[in-house]
């Protein structure tokens, strides 16, 4: 028996969710998904509103190679797999329970997605590169986790690839994404901030700036050496 039925609109998509005796069902547009989860896996009560806000702005292409970073029970990755194909999607999470539940949900929804245990992107096979990375990072006072997501995510994106993130906080994420990517778009949806950042350079902007600074320092150092050499001759 259904115990809850919710309906909300994000952009042009109608999202419907209902609780079932063994899990819950989520409809996003014409994509229908059935899920089970466990109490310690985010978010145990159903589809997270922040994640839904992020998905409302994501634009997928058939050629995309997508990473669901911090996949939880698998909503984002399964939603993407049903549209662009399971072979185009990778899901990962640091928690064994999340990986187990996400794999079960992939099977329930008929998509054979690779679900990997990884501390952020650190343990993913080096050969994997992506055109889209989607993440609803954990909220902590310490920003070390999202910092790693953003910096390593940039390296794993192909040129022209896009990172989407959703959070309750704006300033730190805006500043970090802008520093690494060189620019970021922010949309406020349903009380959440959705960030979209495109990789336009092969090296992070902050790294390029540091290299330029070091290059100038080296030039000045070489110039001083030349002057010292000429003064001694």
Describe the function of each predicted region.
Residues 93-98, 145, 168-169:
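Short beta->alpha hinge that forms the Motif I/post-I loop of the SAM-binding pocket
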Residues 80, 153, 177:
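Class I S-adenosylmethionine-dependent transferase superfamily signal
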Residues 1-29, 40, 217-225, 229-233:
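N-terminal auxiliary segments of SAM/dcSAM-dependent transferases
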Residues 13-61:
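SAM-dependent Rossmann-like transferase core, predominantly class I methyltransferases
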Residues 147-159:
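A short glycine-rich, Lys/Arg-flanked "PGG" loop and its adjoining helix->strand segment in the class I
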Residues 49-135:
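Conserved SAM/SAH cofactor-binding pocket of Class I
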Residues 190-233:
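Core SAM-dependent methyltransferase catalytic element
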Residues 160-167:
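Conserved beta-strand signature within the Rossmann-like core of class I S-adenosyl-L-methionine
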């Amino acid at each position: 028996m259904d115990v809850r039925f919710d309906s909300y609109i994000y952009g042009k998509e109608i999202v419907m969710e209902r609780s079932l005796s063994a899990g819950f069902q989520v409809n996003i547009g014409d994509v229908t998904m059935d899920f089970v989860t466990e109490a310690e896996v985010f978010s145990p009560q159903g589809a997270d509103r922040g994640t839904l806000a992020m998905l409302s702005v994501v634009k997928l292409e058939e050629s995309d190679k997508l990473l669901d970073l911090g996949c939880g029970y698998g909503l984002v990755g399964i939603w993407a797999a049903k549209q662009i194909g399971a072979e185009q999607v990778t899901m990962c999470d640091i928690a064994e329970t999340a990986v187990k539940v996400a794999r079960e949900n992939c099977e329930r929804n008929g998509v054979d997605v690779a679900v990997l245990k990884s501390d952020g992107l650190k343990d993913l096979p080096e050969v994997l590169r992506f055109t889209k990375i989607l993440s609803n990072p954990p909220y902590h006072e310490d920003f070390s986790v999202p910092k790693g997501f953003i910096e390593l995510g940039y390296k794993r994106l192909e040129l022209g690839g896009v990172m989407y993130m959703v959070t309750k906080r704006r300033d730190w994420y805006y500043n970090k994404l802008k520093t690494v990517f060189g620019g970021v778009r922010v949309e406020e949806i349903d009380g959440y901030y959705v960030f979209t950042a495109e990789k336009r350079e092969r090296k992070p902007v902050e790294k390029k700036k540091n290299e330029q600074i070091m290059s100038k320092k080296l030039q000045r150092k070489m110039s001083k050496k030349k002057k010292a050499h000429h003064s001694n001759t």
